[in-house]
């Protein structure tokens, strides 16, 4: 049944109509009533079907709306959370800014202790004082300009200001002059001290030059003495060969004394080389010792020995010659060591003199004891290189 078709009229029957009306008419009315009921039922079914589809559509729409609302709610919740987070960050920043704007005592102390800030404050303080002075001066000038030319107070005030300005200028000049005088005095002292240092440096340079010259001279003398020492060494080797070739006891006795003297003389020259030309006293003592040995040998020559003692004397002379040669070698090695260092120590000199004295025979010392004082007195006249040259001349 469509909406365009008109609905049948509703049939209404009362009890009187049932009693009065005929059967055919009642059936016709009943049919009309049935048609009306069917029309209502069809309309109701149509309405029900339309309502279900509408409800379903509305339900779907409501579900979509609910989903959209839920999504919007989630978005809004997220936005709210972000806003709350931003609010918290803002509150923390506000608190931090408040703390920064209201620094603590420690921060204030640290800022005041900072040298850069202190310098900045000092400059600001100086500028403030200057501006204050300028302001006071301007105010004084302004107040002075307010006075009339005939005003006595204004004249007195300006005269007082001029007097104070002059006094300040004089005080500043005095302070600057005193400081300049102090600086000039200090500068003069420094100049004097520098001149003294320069003079002392020049003296030291001259002294060093003199020392260099002396060292060069000593090196030249050492070279000459080394050459002489080599010559004496060669001569000693020749004398030793001659001594070995000699066969007669008397000749061996006489020739044995000469190498001993020569070995002692060369040993003394070697000991002189250890300390250079300056140690003349030690060389004189050593030459006196050599004088002792030579005079001891001459005394032995004065007294003739028995034939039985000839071999003994030759043996003793050979022993003395061997000892003299060994002592000469030791002295020569020590002399070369001392030549390497021209300023030899006195300990090496005393050690060499002790070695030389220890090589003497007790018999020779006994023989020389009688003439020791006279020989020492004669030998003390010699000095320096002259003693070594005389000894070498006597050996040659």
Curated annotation (Swiss-Prot):
Molecular function GO labels: identical protein binding
Any one of the GO BP annotations: mRNA processing
Induction conditions: In smooth muscle cells, up-regulated after serum withdrawal, when cells become mature and non proliferative.
Coiled-coil intervals, chain numbering: none
Pfam family, one: Wtap
Residues where N-acetylmethionine is found: 1
Description of how the protein assembles with itself and partners: Component of the WMM complex, a N6-methyltransferase complex composed of a catalytic subcomplex, named MAC, and of an associated subcomplex, named MACOM. The MAC subcomplex is composed of METTL3 and METTL14. The MACOM subcomplex is composed of WTAP, ZC3H13, CBLL1/HAKAI, VIRMA, and, in some cases of RBM15 (RBM15 or RBM15B). Interacts with WT1. Also a component of a MACOM-like complex, named WTAP complex, composed of WTAP, ZC3H13, CBLL1, VIRMA, RBM15, BCLAF1 and THRAP3.
Protein name (record): Pre-mRNA-splicing regulator WTAP
Organism: Homo sapiens (Human)
Lineage: Eukaryota, Metazoa, Chordata, Craniata, Vertebrata
Gene name per UniProt: WTAP
């Amino acid at each position: 049944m469509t909406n365009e078709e008109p609905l049948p009229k509703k049939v209404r029957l009362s009890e009187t109509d049932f009693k009065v009306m005929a059967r055919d008419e009642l059936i016709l009315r009943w049919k009309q009533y049935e048609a009306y009921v069917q029309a209502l039922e069809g309309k109701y079914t149509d309405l029900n079907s339309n309502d279900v589809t509408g409800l379903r559509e509305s339900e779907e729409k409501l579900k979509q709306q609910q989903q959209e609302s839920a999504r919007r709610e989630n978005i809004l919740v997220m936005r709210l959370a972000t806003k709350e987070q931003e609010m918290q960050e803002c509150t923390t920043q506000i608190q931090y800014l408040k703390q920064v704007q209201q620094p603590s005592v420690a921060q204030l102390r640290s800022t005041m202790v900072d040298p850069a800030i202190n310098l900045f404050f000092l400059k600001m303080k100086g500028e403030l004082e200057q501006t204050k002075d300028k302001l006071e001066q301007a105010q004084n000038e302004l107040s002075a300009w307010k006075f009339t030319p005939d005003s006595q107070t204004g004249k007195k005030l300006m005269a007082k200001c001029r007097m104070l300005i002059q006094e300040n200028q004089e005080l500043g000049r005095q302070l600057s002059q005193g400081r300049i005088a102090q600086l000039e005095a200090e500068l003069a002292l420094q100049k004097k001290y520098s001149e003294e240092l320069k003079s002392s440096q020049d003296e030291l340079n001259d002294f060093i030059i003199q020392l260099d010259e002396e060292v060069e001279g000593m090196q030249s003398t050492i070279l000459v003495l080394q050459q002489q020492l080599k010559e004496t060494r060669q001569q000693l080797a020749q004398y030793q060969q001659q001594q070995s070739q000699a066969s007669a006891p008397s000749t061996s006795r006489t020739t044995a004394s000469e190498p001993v003297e020569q070995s002692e003389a060369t040993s003394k020259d070697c000991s002189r080389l250890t300390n250079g030309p300056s140690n003349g006293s030690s060389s004189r003592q050593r030459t006196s010792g050599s004088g002792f040995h030579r005079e001891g040998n001459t005394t032995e020559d004065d007294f003739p020995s028995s034939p039985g003692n000839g071999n003994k004397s030759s043996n003793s002379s050979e022993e003395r010659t061997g000892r003299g040669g060994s002592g000469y070698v030791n002295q020569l090695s020590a002399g070369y060591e001392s030549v390497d260092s021209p300023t030899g120590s006195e300990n090496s000199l005393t050690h060499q003199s002790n070695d030389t004295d220890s090589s003497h025979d007790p018999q020779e010392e006994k023989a020389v004891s009688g003439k020791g004082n006279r020989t020492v007195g004669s030998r003390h006249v010699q000095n320096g290189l002259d003693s070594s040259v005389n000894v070498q001349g006597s050996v040659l």
